UniProtKB/Swiss-Prot annotation:
Database matches in NCBIfam families: PRK00033.1-4
Top-level taxon of origin: Bacteria
Organism: Prochlorococcus marinus (strain MIT 9515)
Pfam families, sorted: ClpS
Subunit structure: Binds to the N-terminal domain of the chaperone ClpA.
Gene this chain is encoded by: clpS
Family: Belongs to the ClpS family.
InterPro entries: ClpS, ClpS_core, Ribosomal_bL12_C/ClpS-like
Upper lineage: Bacteria, Bacillati, Cyanobacteriota, Cyanophyceae, Synechococcales
Protein name: ATP-dependent Clp protease adapter protein ClpS
Amino acid sequence: MSIIKLEKGDNNNAAVLEKKTAALKNKSPKYKVLLHNDPVNSMEYITIALREVVPQLSEQDAIAIMLEAHNNGVGLVIVCDLEPAEFYSESLKSKGISSSIEKDE
């Protein structure tokens, strides 16, 4: 919701526009990209694939995510908007790695 306020300037020909936005902006929902435990592919392959698919991950981050999935059954890869989340998950699947997305709460 926006409030627009118009005022006449000194010469009666200029206008000042004041716009106030609501405190709560519409935020797009975020989605979690999840990596599932993979008994088929090697840990090294999964780490490399994570870094190829999500380039902003460091090697240490990729290893930590892979180990989280290995030890707990699922690891959190990244939280982002829906479109990139779908892209990351599908890219991992195309490399034979089990992945899913779910809405972040």
